[in-house]
Amino acid sequence: MFNNLTQRLSDSLKKILNKGRLTEENIKETIREVRKALLEADVALSVIKKFIENVKKKSIGHEINKSLTPGQEFIKIVKHELIFAMGEKNHSLNFSIEPPAVILVVGLQGSGKTTSLAKLGKWIKNKYKKKILITSTDTYRAAAIEQLKILSDQIEIDFFESDKHHTPIEITKNAIKYAKLKLYDVLLIDTAGRLHIDKKMMNEIQQIQVISKAIETLLIVDSMMGQDAINMAKIFNNDLLISGIILTKTDGDSRSGIALSMRYITGKPIKFIGTGEKIISLEPFHPERIADRILGMNDIMSLIEDIEEKVDQSQIQKLTKKLKKGHDFNLNDFLTQIKQMKKIGGLNYFANKFSINHQLSNNISLLNTDKNTLKKIEAMICSMTPKERIKPIIIKGSRKRRIALGSGTQIQDVNKLLKNFDDIRRIMKKIKTDGIAKVIRGIKNMLPKKF
C-alpha cells in the first residue's frame, strides 16, 4: 500500500539529505516534490495543505539539532508531520466496562466487514485471552450469517445463532441477554452492510448502538476506494458514534493517501489495518511505525511482534539445540521452517515490511519466493520417503521422477530444491564454526528461488 509513496518520497528527500545546509530555496523545492508525491498518493487536499504548511513553518529558519545534518533534520520534521496526520499514537480497544463489552462493526457491503470482525475476534482472543461471543444482525443478505458462523468455527469462537425471522434489534437484545447469562467478556456484533448509504441503514445501526450500549463502534473502510472512502467515512462519522476505523485491503495496490487522510478528516483513529486474506492478517495501526515504513526506516517492531505471535518458538529452540549437538540439518527440519514461513505469510511478507529499500529487494531473489513456491516445496518434501528426507544424497534419477510425479512438479523443480537445500545445509554447518557474522553474508542465497 505504501510502496509508491515511499518511492516518491525517497526520491524527493534523497536530494536534500546530503545538502551541507538548508536554504529557503532548496527547502521549497523539496516541499514541492513532497506535495506532488502526496497528491499522487491520493491524500486529501485539506490534509496536504496543512501538512505542507507545518513542514514549511518548522523547517525554514528552524534551529538545527547539532547531532543531525540539515537533511536529517528536515526528514525528522517530515516524519513528525506524518505521525501527526495519522494520529500520533496507537489507540487500543476499550474494555473498561462491565462485561460483556459490546463492539459493533459497521460499513458498506464488500468492504471486508464480516471478515474483519472475525479477524478482530481472533486478535482479541490471542492478545487478551477474553471469552468472546460473535453474532450477526445482517438479516438482509442470505449468506451473511452463515459466512460469519463458518468464520467463527475456524477461529474457535462461540457464535450466537439467531432466528432468521427476528429483526436486527431483537437479535441484538437476545445476544446481549445470552452473553450476560453465559458470562462472556466480549460480544462482537456484525451489522448489515449496504451497497450505498441509506437512511434506513443508519437508523437501524443507531438503534443497535443505543440498545447494546456499545463501547466500541468500528467503521470498516476499504482502502481501495480512495477518496470515495473518505466521503463515506464522513457520513458514518456524522450519523454514528464511531470510536475507530479498521482499514482493509492494505496489502493490495491501493493508494496510501487514505491512511494519511482518514484521522485528519474524521477525527477518529485508525485502530487496525487488514494486511491480507488470512484470518491472522490484522495488525494494530501504529502511526510512528507506519511513518518509518513510508520514509524507508523499516517496520522492525511490527515484524518482531508478528514473528513472536505466529512462529512456534519451541520449534526454533529445538532446531538450535539439534545443531549445537552436531546433528545435520535435514529435509524434515527444512519442512518445519517452510511451515513456519507460511504462517507469517511467506517471504513476500518480509518484502512488504522492507519494501522501502527498492534496490535491495530487487537484487535479493529470495524476496520473490511466494506462497505458491512454498506450497511446491512442501509438496515435494512430503512426497519423499523418511529415509530420503534424512539422507537426500540418495535421491537420484528414478527417485526424482517419483517425487516430481507425486508432488505435481517437474524434475527440474526437484533439482532446484535439492541444490538450494544443500546451500542451506552448508550455511547451517558454518553457524557452528564461524558464527553468525560470517554466515550473514550467505543469507541472500539461503532460501529457495522462485520456481
Curated annotation (Swiss-Prot):
InterPro entries: AAA+_ATPase (IPR003593), P-loop_NTPase (IPR027417), Signal_recog_part_SRP54_M_sf (IPR036891), Signal_recog_particl_SRP54_hlx (IPR013822), Signal_recog_particle_SRP54_M (IPR004125), SRP (IPR004780), SRP54 (IPR022941), SRP54_GTPase_dom (IPR000897). One of its GO terms (biological process) is SRP-dependent cotranslational protein targeting to membrane. Part of the signal recognition particle protein translocation system, which is composed of SRP and FtsY. SRP is a ribonucleoprotein composed of Ffh and a 4.5S RNA molecule. Belongs to the GTP-binding SRP family. SRP54 subfamily. NCBIfam families: ffh (TIGR00959). This is Signal recognition particle protein. The keyword Nucleotide-binding applies. Keywords: Cytoplasm, GTP-binding, Hydrolase, Nucleotide-binding, Ribonucleoprotein, RNA-binding, Signal recognition particle. GO terms for molecular function: 7S RNA binding; ATP hydrolysis activity; GTP binding; GTPase activity. Gene3D superfamilies: P-loop containing nucleotide triphosphate hydrolases, Signal recognition particle SRP54, nucleotide-binding domain, Signal recognition particle, SRP54 subunit, M-domain. Signal peptide: none annotated. It catalyses: GTP + H2O = GDP + phosphate + H(+). GTP binds at residues 107-114, 190-194, 248-251. SUPFAM superfamilies: P-loop containing nucleoside triphosphate hydrolases, Signal peptide-binding domain. It holds the Pfam family SRP_SPB. Involved in targeting and insertion of nascent membrane proteins into the cytoplasmic membrane. Binds to the hydrophobic signal sequence of the ribosome-nascent chain (RNC) as it emerges from the ribosomes. The SRP-RNC complex is then targeted to the cytoplasmic membrane where it interacts with the SRP receptor FtsY. Interaction with FtsY leads to the transfer of the RNC complex to the Sec translocase for insertion into the membrane, the hydrolysis of GTP by both Ffh and FtsY, and the dissociation of the SRP-FtsY complex into the individual components. It is found in: Cytoplasm. One of its GO terms (cellular component) is signal recognition particle. Its EC number is 3.6.5.4. It is an enzyme of class 3 (hydrolase). SMART domains: AAA, SRP54, SRP54_N. Coiled coil: none annotated. Composed of three domains: the N-terminal N domain, which is responsible for interactions with the ribosome, the central G domain, which binds GTP, and the C-terminal M domain, which binds the RNA and the signal sequence of the RNC.
